[in-house]
Amino acid sequence: MYDKLFEPGRIGSVELRNRLVMEPMGVGLANLDGTPTEEMIRYYELRAAGGAGLVIPEICRIDDETGVGELRQISVTRDRNVPQLTRLAEAIHRHGSKTFLQLHHPGRETPNVLLGGKPVVSASAIPCKKTQAETRALSTEEVQHIVQEFIEGAVRAERAGFDGVELHCAHGYLLQQFLSPYTNKRTDQYGGSFENRLRIVTEIIAGIRERCSAGFALGCRVSVEEFLDKTGVTEDYIHTADGVKICMAFEKAGVDFIDVSVGLYETGITCVEPVSYPEGWRHDIIRAVKEHVSVPVIAVSAYRGPDVPEAFLEEGTIDFAGLGRAWLADPEWGNKMQQGRVPELRKCISCLRCFESLEQNAEKCMPLECAVNPECAHELRYGELPIDVDHHRVVVIGGGPGGCQAAETAARRGCKVTLLEKGDRLGGQVLLAERPPRKEKMDFVPQYYETMLPKLGVDVRLGEEATVDSVMAFEPDAVICATGGDPIVPGSIPGIHGENVICVPEALSRESYEGGRVVVVGAGMTGLETAEYIADKGAASVTVVDMVTTPAPGTNQTNLVDLMGRLRAQKVELKLGEKLVEVGADGITVEAVADGERSQVEADLVVLSLGNRPAKELAEGLRKRGVGVCLVGSAVRDGNIAPATRGGYEAARGLFSARAARSSFCMDSADLQKFGAPSVMSDQRGLYLAYTTDPSAIERILPAPLKPFSIPVVTLSVNHILRPSFTDDYYEAILGVYCYLGDQLGQYTMSLLLGGNGAEMATQLGRDNGSMPKKLGTQFSIRKEGSALCVDLARRGHRLVHVEADLGEYNSPLCHLIFQSPAAGKTTKGCGFYYHFDRPALPQGGAHLTGGAINAALVQYDYHKWEPGYVTSIKMESSPDDPWGELPVLSVLGCAYSELDLTVLGEKKLADADAVEFFPYVFAGWYDRTTLGEAGRV
């Protein structure tokens, strides 16, 4: 059916099985040292298995000083990264796909914080108008050094087993900053004339050709058009004719392919298109390049289904179809097309949640997420869906994204699923979201579920509103409520219930507003899109009112810029910083937030866009009847497609899970029903290590009122204390997480294990015996031989920790900051949070928990030695008594071998705490389950 898409092709000497290319796109899955994580390898392997003929992983760093583009980004700056990159290439090759590595330097398009606060670099000292970071021009010598770094990166890529490399000369990054007269004002050999502006790239091409084998593919991704006139720029920049000329020059210099793109950060709306851009919109630009080069052309053009790229191949506009976000949404994109399963395709809706989440999640060291594919970038963590061998009956209430995803997931597990939807079509709020102009792609969501749910055997009942009795009639084993929410109507405002007031659902259902004057209250994206819809339907005037001072705060800026441009063209007026105080027959009264001045806005109709209040009544009624109910989507909190889809997936995935005994720092309260002086630790030697974990793991085990630190950092220390002030020498291992109590930052100790001669006395006299968790009987091994460090920790016959490290440098410079930049001769101070409780005896016998408190240990570290370490291997494992593996290692920041003196300066009570509430969280850190279980206490 799509013969051209699946026709074999060739780039240079590299044979490709089809014409489908997975274009590079950052996902945030690399280790902080630039090596691929196991999760990243799995992510790309699935796309190769899903039919991509060529996989180009995300931007790859070639310079660690000025070239950091993302916190978690793969890198070819060091030889030590090659073995793990080899594993990535091998995983892709395993499925018959080929892989190129994209070599990248961001130049000025990166935040200063990723460079340690230093100015970003560029061809000239011209800041990017989007990032607005302080910018300096590279010296001639620095440019020549970067040329060599690109070449060395290609050499390492070939050694790692990649089939080729792509130079990122697009999207406004460093190489494009040299190519464009807009950003290159240099007067040396790398600026001025057309040839000079291209020199940095042509020198890289020549160097790679000299150092790499003849069969190693080499190409350039080029922004052929910068579109800067759309932003009011009058200076010269790369126009399409210039871009074509650049591509021709690169072909002459020796590249094997051109990957056509457009734009830069300042015109980012053209680089990563929002929902309003149609498939294939770049056709003429791509065609212009294809007509002037003879090497293969790869190009993206917002392809969502197979028809447009097939047509482009048929007419000779492209040689290979590049897809980016489409592979996020459906890793089986290629296979489904080749097997004729087009209706089963989960299409990208161009909502840009992926890019929005990539930025939001970066500070938490977490990857992006996809609004329509809940497994995206978490494939390894989730693993295969658990099969429900008992075929439980599940009723899903609500046919929005959350309910549909829950139904799909439960059905894939083998459950018997019935979905009740009161409307006449699946989709829920998405059916309204697709009503505004240019949002037709939103219909991809219901289209997918309308195909897949019947195919999976889900009993879909449209036009059937659920009640407690109707649901109970199915005798469900579980119910998933995706009942959405009801529009918020602030009843205290006079006139709010008038006949001239409606909410968004009704507003988007009307087909005409011809000649009407309309006010929309609420300047979030929903309100703004509703205003556009009303203007498009013929309203004489549309005004948007809100208390906020900027439209749609917190919204993805690309989507907002796109929408605001259209609203201006439609003359939609925004009155921001104004609070609605009254609704009248002829309009509304608003009050300025700044000074309280009131004014009138004339209107025939008032539309409220103030969000939704979760509809939980049905769920509460079912719970009273003894049914297990999960709430998902807007029935939990008002939100968009992404959390609804993820919530539906996780709710259905977790149903009927085997409740076998598991290791955890947090125990159910039902499992528990049976159940000093400042210290000096001189000459303390051993390991300090930091890594990032899943934020949800910390949230699950952190007792209130402690709040997680913005970066989910776990610290591990394993030390031999040779000269403590209160006992003989002993060994100590601490597992902790950074967190806040109010404004106070500190470390919360999850577990403290002791071993050695003085360990038993240390539990009695060391630190604050009443609030620190301590366990004996641990075996320690700390071996340092030259620059090699190896640490092992075991207890009660179970290995808990194994670490191997090479001393000399960290995995990430962030490690140094986490430990407050230690150095020999330096003193630092810290705070540790610990819980205290009393257990007074009862007159009738027994005891109870009371007197709960959070204490702080204020400590001082006096360093004699601090040797940074690069962790080459780490394993954190759990036993029934010590759940040290419950905080999974996502990315290692680094470690150090230290020699120091630690002094506990004092203890103080910070806050009262409910002993009964927090005790389930501290139990595993203080007591052994195995021992108490054998004694019948738990």
Feature-to-residue mapping (PLM):
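Generic beta-strand/beta-sheet core signal
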Residues: 23, 102-104, 168-170, 176, ...
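Flavin-dependent oxidoreductase catalytic cores
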Residues: 1-397, 401, 409-412, 416-417, ...
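Interaction-surface and assembly-scaffold signal
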Residues: 769-938
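Structured soluble/peripheral alpha/beta segments that form catalytic or ligand/cofactor-binding pockets
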Residues: 51, 669-671, 686-688, 695, ...
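Conserved acidic residues
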Residues: 53, 163, 256, 319, ...
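Rossmann-like dinucleotide/flavin-binding elements
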Residues: 388-422, 461-475, 482-555, 591-658
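N-terminal domain-onset segments
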Residues: 659-730, 869, 873, 877-879, ...
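Rossmann-like dinucleotide-binding cores of NAD(P)H-dependent redox enzymes
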Residues: 416-456, 509, 531-578, 636
